[in-house]
Amino acid sequence: MKAAFFDIDGTLVSFKTHTVSQSTVDAISQLRKNGVKVFIATGRPRPYIDNLGQLEYDGIISANGASCRMTDGTIVRNVLVDKSDLLRLTAYCHQHPMSVAFATEEQSFVNMLSPEFE
């Protein structure tokens, strides 16, 4: 096996503790020692990934595949929403009051708070 891909929620991170267990850290470490590249694969955008603790991995596929980066910073894939589409969407949300969240590689933005985003 050359590579292994792991989801975060319920796979690497416990639904009960919201943390990565020591046994998971140890197992991932052993994979890497055996020469297996370890990747995180998640639907979350990077700003929402904050609970991996001391887990070491080689790369991350985030935002449902829109962003793929190695831990050394190498960008493998980065799909951006076209600026004109983003402007049309924000105008629509302003005209029809609704919350929408956007995320970049470094930050997330919410146009207005609602119970869904609090």
Listing of model-derived features with the role each one plays in the protein:
Residues 2-17, 42:
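Asp-based phosphoryl-transfer active-site loop
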Residues 20-21:
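A short acidic/small-residue loop/turn micro-motif
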Residues 25-117:
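Active-site phosphate-binding/coordination module
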